[in-house]
Design a protein with these regions (language model features):
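Alpha-helical/coil-rich non-catalytic "connector" segments in signaling and regulatory proteins
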Residues: 1-87
Length: 87
């Protein structure tokens, strides 16, 4: 399975460390930016790249992209708390 993750460097780093430990067989592609508007471009690239799903690092970049692009794979975002990546 291939998952796309988009968001800030800081949160992507945490997600990457967690997923490498807990789900080493999962293929993850990262698109990093500290500008929430980049989530739209990242989502479009991920969908063209045939990912199975997209994780946004927060609600702002998720909702911004969702208003402008129709998902063709499952999308979700992480709430802003420390344990959210573990759920």
């Amino acid at each position: 399975m291939k998952i796309g993750v988009t968001g800030s460097d800081h949160i992507c780093d945490r997600i990457q460390k967690t997923l490498e430990k807990r789900m080493p067989d999962l293929e993850v592609v990262y698109r990093r930016s500290n500008d929430y508007r980049y989530g739209l471009e990242a989502a479009a690239q991920f969908q063209k790249g045939k990912v199975s799903g997209i994780i946004f690092t927060g609600p702002t970049n998720y909702h911004y992209a969702l208003k402008r692009l129709e998902p063709n794979v499952p999308w979700t975002f992480l709430p802003h708390n420390q344990a959210s990546i573990l759920k």
